[in-house]
Design a protein with these regions (language model features):
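Terminal catalytic/cofactor-binding subdomain
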Residues: 1-113, 145-157, 189-201, 206-478
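Internal, well-ordered domain-core segments that constitute the primary functional module
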Residues: 108-192
Length: 478
């Protein structure tokens, strides 16, 4: 029997879109803008791939995409706070980038977008990481999880206007609003590649933990969410499903015969009623799949144990409540009860209102502009942030908590040790090497500390070894 993890290590990786609009005739490609964005990081750390003071990773991914990977978190609201802190960190870098460009006589604006597709049809991701027990075979885990992941865009998609282009995955669909940004950009269910085939679940096994006990489930099908309540629903519902799978809860067999065709069709159906073919014969709707998982989660929450660690039942009760309310809206066709809490609904309400007022068709560039500006992480400029200020989009996390999360690592996971080391390293002239499981002071008379357990915030041995490393950092390099 598997262990049920009500305290589970989770993390979110977000790739941001980057673009600039310059005052001069000069144009900067995304690569150049990204280099300017990361210049202060490279100046200070001699690398564009670093760990930030808060234990999270800040780096420039392939294809000029700035990326933020949260430190290890072990509860839901903590994860949402650290995800949001990444936006704040990158917004500050963008402001600095604009100042640098102005000093060089290249005035203009730098835009960082927390979305998943650009105007050229490229896609970039929001990847969710969950530590899961090896007691559950991957095949069984995937079989139960895939139908949930394919259909959960109903409840947590970010929404987008899809305009078909030749050779693109959407070429056979007419223009229109979609529930999900990523649904047109995944090509298979389970795979070990991330970019070439872009699966729903990635199986490349680097658990960053004891590989005999754990595997890291890497989910790459999700949309990046602006809404904190939608992020909490996306991750919280997945946490509940994983707990139920580990507990051996009898979940219905919804193995789909073609996940990829299904995911694209679901994205264009606001009733959730498109029939999907099942592998064992018969059909089922996306709404019915989500309703079954939701009903199971309601029952599970009634018996879910608590020990004061991990995600409390109160946070998951809010998740289950919102989950149910969104599904009820699919039944009635009226989404106004959740139009401040779910990204795709918030965005669609805005686009519909502007389109109606100006009598605009769905392919009008003014609507495309709204679609993009919704995801601008600049709090003074981004449409989502404007809606928050106007009371038209809910928040979950105290802004002070988000700001604190830009400086301090999560106190309840291994990241706490990394955070202490990183703060000491900031004051030091010595070179260091840091990754998820290792802290190292380089050079002669250096030292290293291995941290294989992501749940461990310290021990007498770790604390002593960290103190030794901190002492080394206080010395001048040999």
């Amino acid at each position: 029997v598997s262990t049920v993890h009500t305290r589970r290590i989770t993390g979110l990786e977000t790739e941001f879109g980057i673009t600039s609009v310059l005052d001069s005739h000069r144009r900067l490609g995304p690569d150049e803008v990204a280099r300017y964005l990361f210049a202060p990081v490279v100046d200070r750390y001699r690398s564009s791939n670093i760990y930030w003071r808060n234990g999270s990773r800040v780096y420039l991914d392939v294809g000029a995409h700035p990326e933020y990977a949260t430190a290890e978190c072990d509860s839901l609201h903590q994860l949402v706070a650290y995800d949001r802190s990444g936006e704040v960190i990158f917004h500050r870098l963008a402001e600095q980038c604009e100042r640098t460009l102005a000093e060089r006589g290249i005035g203009g604006k730098v835009y960082l977008l927390k979305n998943n597709t650009d105007s050229l049809g490229n896609s970039y991701g929001c990847h969710e990481n969950f530590l899961v027990s090896r007691d559950v075979p991957l095949k069984a885990l995937s079989a139960q999880l895939l139908p949930f992941l394919v259909t959960r865009q109903l409840i947590c998609g970010a929404g987008k206007i899809s305009v078909p282009s030749p050779g693109a995955p959407n070429e056979n669909f007419g223009p229109g609003f979609c529930l999900s940004q990523r649904s047109d950009h995944v090509w298979e269910g389970v795979s070990s590649a991330t970019t070439r085939s872009r699966p729903i679940i990635n199986t490349r096994d680097e658990p960053h933990a004891d590989s005999a006990r754990y595997r890291r489930l890497h989910v790459i099908v999700g949309d990046s969410n602006m809404s904190e309540t939608t992020t909490a629903l996306k991750v919280g519902s997945a946490l509940l499903v994983l707990e139920m799978i580990e507990a051996g809860v009898e979940l219905p067999d919804f193995e789909l015969s073609n996940e990829i065709r299904s995911i694209r069709e679901i994205s264009r159906d606001f009733s959730g009623s498109t029939p999907l073919d099942l592998r064992n014969g018969g059909t089922v709707t996306a709404l019915a799949i989500q309703q079954a998982f939701h009903a199971a989660a309601v029952d599970w929450l009634d018996q879910r144990g608590e020990d004061g660690t991990g995600t409390p039942n109160s946070q998951l009760a809010d998740v289950v409540d919102l989950w149910g309310r969104v599904l009820d809206c699919f039944g009635t066709g009226d989404f106004s009860p959740v139009d401040t809490e779910i990204d795709w609904v918030i965005k669609k309400s805005l686009i519909d209102a502007v389109a109606e007022r100006g009598n605009l068709g769905i392919t009008d560039p003014r609507l495309a502009q709204i679609d993009l500006t919704y995801h601008d992480i600049n709090p003074d400029r981004g449409l989502f942030h404007l809606l928050v200020r106007r009371g038209r989009a809910k928040t979950l996390i105290d802004p002070a908590e988000i700001l604190a999360a830009t400086e301090q690592a999560p106190a309840t996971t291994r990241a706490a040790v990394r955070g202490k080391f990183l703060h000491a390293a900031e004051e030091s002239t010595r070179q260091t090497t840091v990754d998820w499981t290792r802290l190292k002071v380089n050079g002669e008379g250096g030292g290293e500390l291995l941290l294989p357990d992501p749940f461990c915030t310290g021990s007498p041995e770790i604390d002593a070894a960290l103190a030794d490393l901190t002492d080394l950092l206080a010395e001048a390099p040999a």
